[in-house]
């Protein structure tokens, strides 16, 4: 396992919500539109695109490898079935000096959840730390509640403890890291 910060950029790049958001030296997140933009892919030296959606079609470019992860953005979807295989693929691409773009339709829920799983597995980051880092790079991330439950379970599997938990709110089950902002919107 590499140290938690060894693959991170020396300076945190400016967060982007329309283009590609750089998470580590070799991992980016985006939405489906940006993922099909050849100029963005080539200027960021992307060698592998992982499409975590059923609704976004790939535009295949010959110099890029593509992986399809057909998962809908619904709390009942079993994204956790792909935590290890996607994390392993991202790590493999990095070891070959490549760069991975992980995307879903909006770059908010599915791709973010898989990014968090990767950071936990290969950078030994807690779920809270992985979320804090990823949100600093891409402020719009917000995995759905079902993905959070799966990530919390995955953190327990990896480390034998949890750094966050789900809680009840007027908006339904939410991770406790959202308690403060939820309280500001709706008194709990």
Curated annotation (Swiss-Prot):
At the top level, the lineage of the source is Eukaryota
Return the InterPro entries for the record: Atypical_DUSP_subfamB, Dual-sp_phosphatase_cat-dom, Prot-tyrosine_phosphatase-like, Tyr_Pase_AS, Tyr_Pase_dom, TYR_PHOSPHATASE_DUAL_dom
Write down a Pfam family by its short name.
DSPc
Q: For the Tyrosine-protein phosphatase domain, which residue ranges apply?
A: 19-160
The reaction(s) annotated as catalysed by this protein in its Swiss-Prot or TrEMBL entry are: O-phospho-L-tyrosyl-[protein] + H2O = L-tyrosyl-[protein] + phosphate; O-phospho-L-seryl-[protein] + H2O = L-seryl-[protein] + phosphate; O-phospho-L-threonyl-[protein] + H2O = L-threonyl-[protein] + phosphate
* Predominant location: cytoplasm
EC class of the enzyme, as a word: hydrolase
State any GO BP term from the record: dephosphorylation
Function statement: Can dephosphorylate single and diphosphorylated synthetic MAPK peptides, with preference for the phosphotyrosine and diphosphorylated forms over phosphothreonine. In vitro, dephosphorylates p-nitrophenyl phosphate (pNPP).
Active site per the UniProt annotation: 104
**What organism, scientifically named, is this protein from?**
Mus musculus
Q: What is this protein called?
A: Dual specificity protein phosphatase 18
**Which cell locations does it reside in?**
Cytoplasm; Nucleus; Mitochondrion inner membrane
List the gene name.
Dusp18
- Under the GO molecular function aspect, what terms does this record hold? MAP kinase tyrosine/serine/threonine phosphatase activity; phosphatase activity; protein serine/threonine phosphatase activity; protein tyrosine phosphatase activity; protein tyrosine/serine/threonine phosphatase activity
Keywords, A to Z, come to: Cytoplasm, Hydrolase, Membrane, Mitochondrion, Mitochondrion inner membrane, Nucleus, Protein phosphatase
Which SMART domains does the record cross-reference, listed alphabetically?
Answer: DSPc
